[in-house]
Design a protein with these regions (language model features):
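Metalloprotease/metallohydrolase-associated module, dominated by Zn2+-dependent proteases
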Residues: 1-10, 17, 25, 31-35, ...
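Short active-site segment of divalent metal-dependent hydrolases/proteases
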Residues: 43
């Protein structure tokens, strides 16, 4: 699947997902969500999630299917907790250690009745941070009207985010 984040010229950004079969879903997004969604792509790719946000979209879910009334698979809820910790981390002066990160994930999951998740390793945390940072820089540098394209799942080397200008 190809993730396309378009920086709005006269309005909000849009997120579009073009599936392997050519079908697509899209939505306008609040300014908070482009980096949040890029973090989802990094987390889901590095940790191998296939039933979290982008995995569900790739399997046919519409972006509108993620309304609060729709029950999500456990993996999607776990991914949202993990992405939320990365979102919190962005506001900190330094990244969390693996021990801190895993403790926060554990507390978040238990607080939501989601049980436990395996230990996330230092190399996995580093890789997610690298991808998020690379893609966030590309998003920030994108001109209004431009589109950032990222494959999902990201290849092991992270692939390259392609920025293009809209006509």
């Amino acid at each position: 699947m190809m993730i396309q984040l378009r920086k709005g010229r006269d309005g909000p950004a849009t997120l579009a997902c073009v599936r392997a079969d050519g079908s697509r879903t899209w939505s306008k997004v609040h300014p908070f969500f482009p980096v949040h969604d890029l973090t989802h792509c990094a987390v889901e790719s590095v940790l191998g999630f296939r039933e979290a946000f982008f995995g569900l979209v790739a399997s046919g879910w519409s972006l509108d299917d993620f309304a609060p009334r729709v029950p999500l698979p456990n993996e999607a809820r776990q991914a949202e907790c993990i992405v939320g910790i990365f979102d919190l981390e962005r506001a900190q002066p330094a990244p969390y250690s693996a021990a801190q990160f895993n403790e926060m994930v554990s507390a978040s999951l238990q607080g939501q009745g989601l049980g436990t998740f395996r230990h996330i390793t230092d190399p996995e945390l580093t890789r997610v941070r690298e991808l998020r940072s690379q893609w966030s820089r590309s998003w920030a540098a994108l001109e209004l009207g431009g589109t950032l394209e990222i494959p999902f799942p990201a290849p092991p080397d992270g692939g390259s985010a392609a920025a293009r200008r809209s006509a």
